[in-house]
């Protein structure tokens, strides 16, 4: 009897393994230049952070905007394998104030956190001239320059 119970248990365990849902990947957009981060602004758009210094938008339809949301390639140093535009975070009150923050490697090779504003006329375009530097951190090496920035549950 004990052997029969074990056999039945073994068979049911085998069946359970094969009844798991299948997981797959679906390509929704392509053509990015070294994408390093993806986030949203609390709406249906996806913002793709690209290491050379652009942030692109994927609309809910899957269409990638032809004009980048932000283009700071002229001030980003992406010469090292772990340098460049490294992260982005939207202010918790972004829908009201239009602030977002980026972390990038500046021309001196230092880590730079800056605030930018969305343009007043188009929610899909940032105001490149609105940069407000927040923090600069010396980076003596071109690697291990992590760049993820986030707001916590306390909105800080």
Residues of each region from the PLM?
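Bacterial Sec-dependent N-terminal signal peptides
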Residues: 1-21
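Acidic, Gly/Ser/Thr-rich repeat motifs that build Ca2+-stabilized beta-propeller blades
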Residues: 20-156
């Amino acid at each position: 009897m004990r052997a029969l119970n074990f056999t039945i248990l073994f068979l049911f365990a085998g069946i359970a393994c094969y009844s798991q849902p299948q997981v797959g990947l679906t390509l929704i957009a392509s053509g990015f230049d070294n994408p390093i981060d993806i986030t949203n602004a609390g709406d249906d758009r996806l913002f793709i952070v690209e290491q050379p210094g652009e942030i692109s938008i994927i609309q809910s339809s899957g269409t990638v905007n032809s004009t980048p949301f932000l283009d700071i390639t002229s001030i980003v140093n992406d010469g090292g394998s772990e340098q460049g535009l490294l992260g982005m975070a939207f202010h918790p009150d972004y829908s009201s104030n239009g602030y977002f923050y980026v972390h990038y490697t500046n021309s001196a090779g230092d880590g730079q956190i800056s605030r930018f504003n969305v343009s007043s006329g188009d929610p899909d375009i940032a105001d490149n001239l609105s940069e407000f530097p927040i923090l600069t951190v010396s980076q003596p090496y071109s690697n291990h320059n992590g760049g993820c920035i986030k707001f916590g549950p306390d909105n800080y």
